[in-house]
């Protein structure tokens, strides 16, 4: 556990050192080359200048040490000459007095040690014998005995490190007629001026080093505030202007040429800003004109750039593709178009881009017809036109014009169906009339009167059928014109009874119960009598046509109150008469309910069992609109249908 803790600590220290090294490397790499060269030059100059006092100090120290060594040798020889006779006479008291006197009279002596011939301490000052044993290694003297013997009275100079301060340690043998009497060890303090000069030299070196760096830093700061800062401000301003930001200004209190440069820069930026504002206003005005023009176009318009991103789209295109509330400007067109449109449109767009960029050919306008069949049926006519830079023939964008031809296609289909139906309906009675008349003409001698009357009756019936068909077409044409139909007070009950009497026999033949339910005292309504008769006839006729035997048809009328708003927002109750024609017929699907009132459309187009021109309900809708009302339908497939509309009650009622 202890070893794992140590490993964890070592790993943490290693990671810490790695982080520091990496940060230093990153810091150094972020420094510019010019700054690195300046820093290295400053470091070399500062080290060189600060090393000069140290060199002088070293030379002075060597000279002082030589002087101290000579002084120590002379002093030790003088002391040895005086001590040798005393040591020879083994006069310890005299030796003690002499050495103490010599020690006290000479301030430069740090200590005096006297050893006998066996290397034992004979006398020491100012240390005791125990201290000498602890501080000095006596084995050194044992090693020197042989050397001392041979070198006679030659002093040996050492520099001990077991005492504080600069000390010259001198060892001199005490010989008498080549007999070793002992060893004298003197410690002499070094010249105090040497220590003082060393400290002064160190302080001067540090001061020189710091002064050089301080001067460089102050110079760099002065340069940064007086030259570098305005240059950086100018560089930033130039970059901003190059990027299109003309609001950049420099406000620095400088005079001279630098101040003139700043002033001219600000003046240039101000002129560019005014020029940009003028261009923006002009472009905005032109864009507004273009958008207004595009928005008034009935067709959808989309402008793409060369990367097929939307630049402009008008209201018609937004409504066609359901882009209300979506900000598609700057987005890829394929991200917002339905999938089936993309499948047909995107290859054409890619083909235009490819021809203009790869083949360098000018692509003419392309026309595409797109039919949607999935969610809803729509037909679009799409025109793709390239937008080129005619100076360099480079593709700048693609203009897409979208024409919604759904209604046109549907009308063409309905018209074709109508023509087919009318042609068939006209051909059938005409063929029947012609056949029976030709038969009467060719075989009139062989036919009896009963057969002739029967043929004439059939021809007359077909003539009536042909007349109704022509009348329906004429009625619809007349109703869709601007012809005015006067509305006046009329008896609705009378019109209902007249219509019911007309169709009562047909209902009886089909075993259908035709029932009327009229509210008592029903007031007169405001309408056109002949047109109201036509409404009732068409609706009852349709009910009879689509109701099977044993079915029921109910015609119901009653009064209702309809709320309308006056100018002061106070509700105004308007009395109306509601007319309902309900049956238990085949019913109408929800899909067909939305189109049942369209022109030229018949429900039998989907049933294929009944006859008709498909104009009846369209005529009814137009007549009711002439009466300032709307017709409504509620129907369930195979359960029946109910048509109802409201008519305004006449004021004189």
Swiss-Prot record:
Residue positions where Phosphohistidine is found in the record: 424
GO cellular component: chloroplast membrane
Taxonomic source organism: Pyropia yezoensis
Record EC number: 2.7.13.3
Entry's Gene Ontology BP terms: regulation of DNA-templated transcription
Cystine pairs: none
Gene3D superfamilies listed in its UniProt record: 1.10.287.130, 6.10.340.10, Histidine kinase-like ATPase, C-terminal domain, PAS domain
Domain of life assignment: Eukaryota
Entry-linked CDD domains: HAMP, HisKA, PAS
GO MF: ATP binding; phosphorelay sensor kinase activity
Alphabetic keyword roster: ATP-binding, Chloroplast, Kinase, Membrane, Nucleotide-binding, Phosphoprotein, Plastid, Transferase, Transmembrane, Transmembrane helix, Two-component regulatory system
Keyword Transferase assigned: yes
The keyword Membrane appears for this protein: yes
Domain Histidine kinase residue range list: 421-651
Topology class, membrane: Multi-pass membrane protein
Residue ranges constituting the HAMP domain according to the UniProt record: 225-277
Location of this chain's protein in the cell: Plastid, Chloroplast membrane
Domain PAS: residue ranges: 286-356
Transmembrane segments: 39-59, 207-227
InterPro entries attached to this UniProt entry: HAMP_dom, HATPase_C_sf, His_kinase_dom, HisK_dim/P_dom, HisK_dim/P_sf, PAS, PAS-like_dom_sf, PAS_fold
Name of protein: Uncharacterized sensor-like histidine kinase ycf26
Catalytic reaction equation(s): ATP + protein L-histidine = ADP + protein N-phospho-L-histidine
């Amino acid at each position: 556990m202890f070893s794992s803790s140590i490993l964890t600590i070592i790993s943490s220290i290693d990671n810490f050192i790695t982080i520091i090294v990496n940060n230093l490397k990153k810091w150094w790499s972020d420094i510019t080359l010019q700054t690195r060269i300046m820093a290295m030059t400053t470091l070399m100059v500062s080290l060189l200048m600060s090393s000069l006092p140290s060199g002088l100090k070293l030379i002075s120290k060597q000279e002082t040490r030589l002087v101290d060594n000579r002084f120590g040798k002379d002093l030790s020889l003088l002391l040895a000459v005086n001590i040798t006779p005393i040591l020879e006479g083994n006069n310890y008291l005299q030796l003690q007095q002499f050495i103490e006197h010599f020690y006290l009279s000479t301030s430069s002596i740090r200590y005096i040690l006297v050893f006998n011939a066996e290397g034992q301490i004979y006398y020491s000052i100012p240390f005791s014998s125990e201290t000498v044993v602890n501080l000095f290694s006596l084995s050194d003297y044992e090693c020197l005995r042989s050397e001392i013997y041979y070198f006679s009275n030659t002093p040996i100079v050492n520099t001990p490190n077991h005492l504080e301060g600069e000390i010259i340690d001198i060892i001199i043998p005490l010989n008498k007629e080549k007999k070793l009497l002992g060893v004298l060890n003197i410690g002499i303090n070094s010249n105090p001026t040497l220590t003082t000069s060393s400290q002064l030299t160190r302080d001067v070196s540090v001061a020189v080093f710091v002064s050089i760096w301080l001067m460089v830093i102050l110079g760099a700061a002065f340069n940064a505030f007086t030259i570098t800062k305005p240059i950086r401000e100018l560089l930033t301003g130039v970059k901003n202007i190059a990027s299109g930001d003309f609001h950049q200004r420099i406000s620095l209190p400088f005079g001279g040429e630098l101040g003139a440069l700043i002033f001219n820069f600000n003046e240039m930026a101000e002129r560019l800003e005014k020029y940009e504002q003028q261009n923006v206003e002009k472009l905005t005005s032109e864009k507004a004109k273009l958008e207004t023009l595009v928005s008034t176009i009935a067709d959808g318009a989309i402008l793409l750039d060369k990367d097929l991103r939307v630049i402009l789209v008008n209201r018609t295109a937004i409504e066609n593709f359901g882009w209300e509330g979506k900000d598609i400007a700057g987005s890829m067109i394929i991200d917002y178009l339905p999938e089936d449109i993309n499948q047909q449109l995107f290859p054409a767009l890619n083909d235009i881009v490819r021809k203009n960029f790869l083949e360098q050919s000018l692509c003419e306008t392309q026309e595409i017809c797109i039919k949607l069949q999935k969610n809803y049926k729509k037909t679009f006519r799409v025109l793709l036109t390239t937008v080129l830079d005619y100076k360099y023939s480079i593709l700048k964008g693609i203009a897409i014009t979208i024409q919604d031809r759904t209604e046109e296609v549907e009308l063409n289909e309905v018209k074709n169906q109508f023509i087919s139906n009318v042609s068939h309906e006209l051909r059938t009675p005409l063929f029947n009339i012609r056949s029976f008349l030709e038969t009467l003409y060719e075989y009139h001698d062989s036919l009896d009167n009963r057969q002739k009357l029967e043929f004439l009756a059939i021809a007359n019936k077909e003539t009536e059928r042909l007349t109704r068909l022509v009348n329906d077409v004429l009625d619809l044409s007349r109703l869709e014109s601007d012809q005015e139909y006067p509305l006046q007070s009329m008896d609705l009950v009378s019109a209902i009874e007249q219509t019911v009497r007309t169709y009562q026999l047909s209902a009886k033949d089909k075993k259908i119960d035709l029932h009327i339910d009229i509210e008592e005292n029903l007031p007169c309504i405001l309408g056109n009598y002949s047109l109201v008769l036509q409404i009732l006839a068409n609706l009852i006729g349709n009910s009879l046509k689509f109701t099977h035997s044993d079915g029921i048809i109910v015609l119901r009328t009653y009064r209702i109150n309809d709320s309308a708003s006056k100018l002061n927002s106070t509700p105004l109750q308007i009395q109306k008469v509601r007319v309902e024609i309900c049956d238990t017929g085949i019913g109408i699907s929800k899909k067909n309910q939305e189109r049942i009132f369209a022109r030229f459309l018949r429900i039998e187009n989907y049933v294929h069992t009944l006859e008709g021109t498909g104009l009846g309900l369209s005529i009814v809708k137009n007549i009711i609109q002439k009466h300032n009302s709307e017709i409504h339908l509620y129907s369930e497939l195979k359960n029946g249908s109910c048509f109802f509309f409201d008519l305004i009650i006449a004021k004189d009622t």
